[in-house]
Amino acid sequence: MHEAFTIEQLPPSWQEQLKDEWSQPYWSQLLAFLKSEYAQATIYPKKENVFAALQSTPFDQVRVVILGQDPYHGEGQAHGLSFSVPRGQALPPSLRNIFQELHTDLGIRNESGCLQAWADQGVLLLNTVLTVRAGEAFSHAGRGWERFTDAIVTKLIQNRTHVIFVLWGNAARQKCNLLFQTKHQHAVLACPHPSPLAAHRGFFGCCHFSKINYLLKKQGKTMINWKIE
């Protein structure tokens, strides 16, 4: 089980940034918890997909961070990228709203909910907590993942410049407010969460997709192609 969560699973650029986390006491406690959980319950995503966000978007290639909460807890949904589902899966409500805003903003219609194409272009689709029990939202909160993902965000803030942090909802905003206390050279886009409960409070109409591309263009970088083929 421990072999499933080794630093060797990460791209070299993330290994260099996160190597100290593997020796922290919280990490061995988290591993022990995960070993027990995967042995006795159905846990999402599959072990090999837990680090999919980091594997898909190496540290030196991150241009945008879209921060989620914890993985989808329905069967076959979570595959390691925040808000994303594998091809062929029905769109969860939050993702449906994300695609609705994308269409309003840029006229793009996406059918597949697999956001791998975004990750491949430098969009880090990172959840705050990387695992969950089937059918039990937030069941792995407070077990150590938050500290690990704090380290990820902190390394990006400290060791990269001009990353665009996209914070949808209070949880993402609160997490990053704590970490953004030092002066930094990054852009932050924030609005309510795309869930049906909050989307009408300001997520719809946020135009974050066009704003991200405006900022990238201003930096002289290639814009994100949000269309999923």
Curated annotation (Swiss-Prot):
**Entry's EC annotation:** 3.2.2.27
Q: Which reaction does it catalyse?
A: Hydrolyzes single-stranded DNA or mismatched double-stranded DNA and polynucleotides, releasing free uracil
Report the subcellular localization.
Cytoplasm
Q: Does the keyword DNA repair apply?
A: yes
A single GO BP term for this record reads:
base-excision repair, AP site formation via deaminated base removal
Name the top EC class.
hydrolase
Q: Name one GO molecular function term.
A: uracil DNA N-glycosylase activity
Which residues are annotated as active site?
70 (proton acceptor)
**SMART domains with a match to the protein in the record:** UDG (SM00986), UreE_C (SM00987)
Keywords, alphabetical: Cytoplasm, DNA damage, DNA repair, Hydrolase
Whether Ion transport counts among this entry's keywords is no
Biological role: Excises uracil residues from the DNA which can arise as a result of misincorporation of dUMP residues by DNA polymerase or due to deamination of cytosine.
Q: What is this protein called?
A: Uracil-DNA glycosylase
Species this chain originates from: Chlamydia trachomatis serovar D (strain ATCC VR-885 / DSM 19411 / UW-3/Cx)
Q: What is the lineage of its organism?
A: Bacteria, Pseudomonadati, Chlamydiota, Chlamydiia, Chlamydiales
